[in-house]
Curated annotation (Swiss-Prot):
Gene Ontology BP annotations: base-excision repair
Name by which UniProt lists this protein: Formamidopyrimidine-DNA glycosylase
Origin species: Stenotrophomonas maltophilia (strain R551-3)
SMART domains: Fapy_DNA_glyco, H2TH
Keywords annotated in UniProt: DNA damage, DNA repair, DNA-binding, Glycosidase, Hydrolase, Lyase, Metal-binding, Multifunctional enzyme, Zinc, Zinc-finger
Active-site residue list: P2, E3, K58, R260
Database matches in PROSITE patterns: FPG_CAT, ZF_FPG_1, ZF_FPG_2
Binding site for DNA: H91, R110, R151
Entry keyword Lyase: yes
FPG-type Zn finger ranges: 236-270
Coiled coil start-end: none
Reaction equation(s) it catalyzes: Hydrolysis of DNA containing ring-opened 7-methylguanine residues, releasing 2,6-diamino-4-hydroxy-5-(N-methyl)formamidopyrimidine; 2'-deoxyribonucleotide-(2'-deoxyribose 5'-phosphate)-2'-deoxyribonucleotide-DNA = a 3'-end 2'-deoxyribonucleotide-(2,3-dehydro-2,3-deoxyribose 5'-phosphate)-DNA + a 5'-end 5'-phospho-2'-deoxyribonucleoside-DNA + H(+)
Length: 270
C-alpha cells in the first residue's frame, strides 16, 4: 500500500498540472470502489477551479470553492495526468477532464482506493480524529512520550496508529525503529522521552529522504510520471528477515506484530 512518501510524491507530481485548472467534466466508469463514489463528485466538480492539491495523511485533496475531492490510492491505485485522447487501459475507473484538454485518470486494479467528496467548510469523517503530520514541528519526542503513557501496545503498533501520527505505515515504521535502536516489541508506555525523541527524529529523517527518492516501489506504486520509487533499494530491515543486520551482521528477526509482518535486529534494537 502506498505510504506517506508515495502519496506526497504523487501530490508533488500532480500539483503543477492541476492547480489553477478548471474541471471540464467527470467520467465515472466504475463507482463501486472501496466506498461507492458519491454523486457529488460528478455533480459538484465540473466548472470548479482546482485551487490547491493537498495531502492529509495518505489522502489527496483537490480543493475547489465548492469543496474537495478526497482521493485514496488504496493498495494499487495510481493517478496520472494524460492527454485527453489517451486510450483506456484495464481498471481506468475515473477521468477528471480539465480545461486545457488534459485529464486526471484514476486507475485501480484492486479497487481498494476511494474517491469521495468533502463539502466546503466541512471535514470528511475519514479525516477526523487524525494525529499530527510526522513532518510537522508538533510531532516530536515530547508528543510521543505524552501520548504513550499507559499504553501497553508494542511501540510499532503505537507508531502506526493514525490517531497518534498519520502516514507512518509498515515500511517506514520498521525503518525508523531500526534507526532509533528501538525494538518494535517494546511496550510503548515504557520508552523514555529521550528515546522517543530519537524515534521522532528518525521518522522525520527517513520520511523526508524517502520523499526525495520518490517513495518505495513495492509491487504496485509508480509516481504520476510513471517512474518507480527508489527508496526500496535502500531499505535496511523491511523485507530482509533472515539476512544480516547492516550494523552488526547478525540475522534479522521476523514476527507478526499487530497483524503486520515485522523485521528487526534483536541485538541493535532494544
Amino acid at each position: 500500500m502506498p505510504e506517506l512518501p508515495e502519496v506526497e510524491t504523487t501530490r508533488r507530481g500532480l500539483a503543477p498540472h492541476l492547480q489553477g485548472r478548471r474541471v471540464h467534466g467527470v467520467i465515472l466508469r466504475r463507482a463501486d470502489l472501496r466506498w461507492p463514489i458519491p454523486p457529488e463528485v460528478a455533480g459538484q466538480l465540473p466548472g470548479q477551479r482546482i485551487d490547491a492539491v493537498r495531502r492529509r495523511a495518505k489522502y489527496l485533496l483537490l480543493d475547489t470553492a465548492a469543496g474537495s475531492a478526497v482521493l485514496h490510492l488504496g493498495m494499487s491505485g495510481s493517478l496520472r495526468v494524460l492527454p485527453g485522447d489517451t486510450p483506456l487501459r484495464a481498471h481506468d475507473h475515473v477521468d477528471i477532464s480539465l480545461d486545457n484538454g488534459r485529464l486526471l485518470r484514476f486507475n485501480d486494479p484492486r479497487r481498494f482506493g476511494s474517491l469521495l467528496w468533502q463539502p466546503a467548510g466541512e471535514v470528511h469523517p475519514l479525516l477526523q480524529g487524525l494525529g499530527p503530520e510526522p513532518l510537522d514541528d508538533a510531532f516530536d519526542g515530547n508528543y510521543l512520550f505524552a501520548r504513550s503513557r499507559g499504553r501497553s501496545a508494542p511501540v510499532k503498533t503505537f507508531l502506526m496508529d493514525q490517531a497518534v501520527v498519520v502516514g507512518v505505515g509498515n515500511i517506514y515504521a520498521a525503518e525508523s525503529l531500526f534507526k532509533a535502536g528501538i525494538s518494535p516489541l517494546r511496550e510503548a508506555g515504557k520508552i523514555s522521552r529521550e528515546r522517543y525523541q530519537r524515534l521522532a527524529d528518525a521518522v522525520k529523517e527517513i520520511l523526508g529522504y524517502a520523499i526525495t527518492r520518490g517513495g518505495t516501489t513495492l509491487r504496485d506504486f509508480i509516481s504520476p510520471d510513471g517512474a518507480p520509487g527508489y527508496f526500496e533499494q535502500e531499505l535496511l530491515v523491511y523485507g530482509r528477515d533472515g539476512l544480516p543486520c547492516p550494523n552488526c551482521g547478525r540475522a534479522l528477526k521476523h514476527a507478526t506484530i499487530g497483524q503486520r509482518a515485522s523485521v528487526w535486529c534483536s541485538h541493535c534494537q532494544r
